[in-house]
Amino acid sequence: MADDLQRKGMELRTQLFGEKAAKAGHEYLRGFDEDFANFLNEQVFGAIWTRPGLPTKTRSFITMAALMALGRGPELKIHMRGALNLGISRDEIKELIIHLSQYSGVPTAVEAIRVLGEVTEPRK
């Protein structure tokens, strides 16, 4: 079961972040602790992200909303790139930021706007 979750987790991470970034992210965490890296890959990406109840794009929106509300800019940047890779548009992310600004506050929205600019500028 763990091997299957590892495989599913890496497939999902590759879909989100691309092969190079998925492998680099996993290796970075393995440098910290191999068990922790494997646990995150299995549980977060292999078990939770691949559950049948929600589409991957919806899970991506939920993740971005949580990271924005928590003020986690570096992780938000990673997941905004993933969202764009899934086909979520810049305008859809913009609407998420506007909507969430009323629940998490203007400062978190301004930070998310900055992050979105960093992510989408090179794509123009």
For the regions a language model picked out, list residue spans one by one.
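C-terminal structural segments of small proteins and small subunits
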Residues: 101-109
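Short acidic/histidine-centered micro-motifs embedded in hydrophobic/aromatic stretches
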Residues: 96-100, 115-116
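Extended intrinsically disordered, low-complexity coil regions enriched in Ser, Thr, Gly, Ala
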Residues: 73-92, 110-114
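Short alpha-helix boundary/capping elements
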Residues: 66-72, 104-105
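Acidic, glycine/proline-rich low-complexity segments that act as flexible tails and inter-domain linkers
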Residues: 1-57, 85, 109-124
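Short, structured motif recognition centered on aromatic/hydrophobic residues
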Residues: 59-67, 96-97
